Amino acid sequence: MKKLIMGAALTLLAGGAQAADDVTLQLKWVTQAQFAGYYVAAAKGCYEEEGLNVTILPGGPDIAPSQVIAGGGADVVVDWMPSALAAREKGLPLVNIAQPFASSGMMLTCLAETGIKAPADFADKTLGVWFYGNEYPFLSWMSQLGLATDGSAGGVTVLKQGFNVDPLLQKQAACISTMTYNEYWQVIDAGITPEQLVTFKYQDMGVATLEDGLYVLEDKLADPAFAERMVKFVRASMKGWKYAEANPDEAAMIVLDNDTTGAQTEVHQKRMMGEVAKLTAGSNGALDVAAAEKTVATLMAGGSDPVITAAPTGAWTSAITDLALQ
């Protein structure tokens, strides 16, 4: 079984042996190029150089990063801001300390044969939507379009989509949720051509929310030793991300080396890394506060059922990146 030992257990110094600082990272999803920067940082010794021993935990359909960190199973998690803010409003004090992804990769992918050409055409159609926190951007978008999501006339029928593209292939839905770097290509690989599809990127529609940020528990940041570990972790992780952007094929192979399931393929991971690089491009890891505020505004635009009911305070900090990016 392929497994990469993250970081170094011991760093030998002139004065003796000093144990590396442990950091556990919980990913939002399974091992794939969506998280290449962290695997690359480990493989290239970036964490080791910072004196860190980083354990990377893959996610999955039954793993919620917020629940893992709440239970003490991770020091830092990768999550989308909508789900992090929703969790914060419900009492889990998650704080964004860095934002490697500058752009959103989320979109609706529709069959052209359904007649959908613009968002207004969603009316009276069935749309596949991911849940478990991934539904928040979609629900806000539909609210802004004035489309009810209860299946009533003139609204849309929401199909609770599994983490696959079957509803589109089987024509159970006119559109499904996809990521630019993953499920869209699963549709293409299934034999449907780009010309047979119509896509609506959340980024282009003006309803994008921030994805794949790094989150910790607020009270932990009060500990100077923990904060220092996070500064080192973010600095090393961003080195990994920039290397992955510049060397996408190599990064994809590093990801494959860490896929203990054997489910990923070289073709898919190289393609995914090429698309993910477009989303991390332009980010040095520091959160764009304007983008965060836009995310908040989008989530609060949910009419009678907003994702969050009040603008959060203390939901992000630049304290870590200010030091990490000096």
Question: What would you call each of these model-derived segments?
Answer:
Residues 1-4:
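Positively charged n-region of N-terminal signal peptides that target proteins for export
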